[in-house]
Amino acid sequence: MASPIRFFQPGQFSRGAVAAGAAALLLSASACGGGDGGGGGGQGGATPDVQPDEELAALVPQEVRDAGTLTVGTDSSYAPAEFLDTDGKTIIGFDVELFDAVAAKLDLDVAWESATFGTIVEGVDSGKYDVGISSFTINEERLEQVNMVSYYNVGTQWFTAKGDPAGVDPENACGKTIAVQANTVQVPDIEARSEQCEEDGEPAIQIDQYEGQDEATQSIVSGKSDAGLADMPVAFYAIEQTGDKLEALGEQYEAAPYGAVVHSDSDELAEAIQAGYQSIIDDGTYEQILDGWGLADQGLIEESEVNPDIAAEDEDGEA
């Protein structure tokens, strides 16, 4: 298990005027449209003014430099990392602002495109997207398919309806109905727990998988699901935005790095993106952006890496 990260407390997401409220969080995934911006009204703090760095820009592969724009696939249903602003079109979030800053360092523009989470890695692999930015946990399975550039650490958090009416115990959720977003690291987590239930002679967990996290959250709010699990900042953002309708269960666990997804043959681009992340970490832009989202004390890293050794990090108890 990874080293602990300080946890969110209620109210930490209120630094920006969260005008979208619960309605923005619970937008149906079918309403997700393309967006081309990372700024956006009322969320996060003031976007830092990031200037191009000539040395970093020189690392960008020539074909990308000639294009001048990185096409980035993201699932815009995963607040506060990536989600739609109140206009229903512009994609905002801390993931978006961080990568926009990286692109600015590399003297590149970004074209953000909404996509279903489970299609983004394939989209990068096929060349549809240059990069995938969508709170992707770096794991061995993904590293076998693509390059990944680390930029943030986060674990899994359980949450349920206020007062826990279904009496859900994350360590023994046998027979409960649990909501998760499809294709996330939470799916094998809950599947393993369900298998253990059956081995122990207990009823299996009913696992409800949804294309978007907003839909999974709504199923808990509506009472269709007893509880859910998601990446920690997403779970606490849902709790914040739904007022008194949700609450956390226990603490986060198994913290691991998020990574930007780059084609397996695009080593130069991956290295350039890593250098961009490292630059914003070193000059304080990284912390400034995360602070604007109430995340300055959660999951920050000091060193971005291309394809970090996950097994070694687990053994060392780090990240």
What are these regions (language model features)?
Residues 76, 153-160, 236, 240-278, ...:
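Periplasmic-binding protein-like
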Residues 27-31:
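C-terminal motif of bacterial Sec signal peptides marking the signal peptidase cleavage site
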Residues 79, 91-104, 136-137, 154-212, ...:
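Bilobed "Venus flytrap"/periplasmic-binding protein-like clamshell domains
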Residues 33, 46-50, 96-99, 104, ...:
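Extended ligand-binding regions for polar small-molecule ligands
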Residues 109-172:
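Acidic, polar ligand-binding/catalytic clefts
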